[in-house]
Amino acid sequence: MKIARNSMRAGMLGILALSLSAVYAQERAKPGVTDVEMKFQAGDSPMGKVEMHQNINPKAPPMTKAEFERGKQIYFERCAGCHGVLRKGATGKPLTTDKTIASGTEYLKVFINYGSPAGMPNWGTSGELSDADVDLMARYVQQEPPSPPEYGLKEMAASHKVLVPVSQRPTRKQNSFNIENIFSVTLRDSGEIALIDGDSKKTIAIIKTGYAVHISRMSKSGRYLYVIGRDAKINLIDLWMAKPDTVAEIKVGLEARSVETSKFKGFEDRYAIAGTYWPPQFTIMEGDTLKPLKIESTRGMTVDTQEYHPEPRVASIVASHYNPEFIVNAKETGKILVVNYRDFNNLKITSI
């Protein structure tokens, strides 16, 4: 009798346990999700805690924010010069998303890796980019291009530094270098230039500059050397110092290619001018301090189709020896701007 009662109690407890389990399971159950899916597919994804780049185009392949920032850096350093900051094309073809997404990731990887006969470098097979970076860039150019910020007088003034005031600089040359025979050699990826004595073939100095110096220009007097990096940082180097070095610096934009100084009689070394790819503008500065004085935009209508262009990049700038003028070349609008600085407060700009 006792055995029967104990068996009955055990059975009732088992039924109670099963009932509670069923109720608990019902509380946790998700409609349309099987037990197998709950057990084997509900684990955390490694990407769950990674902040993703949010693209307004749903067809673009996924990228993390870190990948997007890496792609943006590579694009600026390697691609923007030919394809444009806004990716609308220049020397290279447009890389707008209507074209890149239609091409697809694998197609783009082939072009980035092997290049093309039209002049596209073989970034992958040359060793410049790793396989991972090639894949990253193929996905990056399928994202909507980020809108770069504008860069005005406020930003320039914040970056401006006079490291050696004019009053503390040499009043006469303090070295024996033949400044008419000095080479300024760009050390691209290290962000430096090397000054080479053309007479002795020895290195005078290696000077920290902006990224990938694009051009070095001598002042009319021969005393100052102006160098500008692709990141739009300008170094003013005094060649009269015992060891030539930077005496002033400024960043005039986000990407640039050109710098020049006034060379007309009576205005020698008075002004410096720099043109930027982004923002599309040129800036005139004090020649001996790089203090920014005036900014002029190059945005406007193209000469052929008379359409507004948001990114007319400033290419070369040349100073006239015969008139108080800078000749500024604006690429995408197809214009040459002759900037007369005789009356500086009322610049006369002639468009050709």
Report each predicted region and the residues it spans.
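Extracytoplasmic electron-transfer domains, predominantly the class I c-type cytochrome c fold
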Residues: 27-43, 86, 90, 96-146
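Electrostatic cytochrome c docking/interface patches
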Residues: 40-74
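Sequence/structural segment immediately N-terminal to covalent heme-attachment motifs in c-type
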Residues: 64-85, 107-114
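Beta-strand-rich domains and repeat architectures in extracellular enzymes and scaffolds
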Residues: 159-220
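Repeated scaffold domains used in trafficking and secretory/extracellular systems
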Residues: 171-172, 212-218, 254-263, 303-318
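Short coil/turn segments that connect the beta-strands within blades of beta-propeller domains
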Residues: 180-181, 221-223, 268-270, 323-324
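Short loop/turn segments that connect beta-strands within beta-propeller blades
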Residues: 198-200, 239-242, 287-289, 341-344
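A short beta-strand motif characteristic of beta-propeller blades
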Residues: 202-207, 245-250, 291-307, 345-352
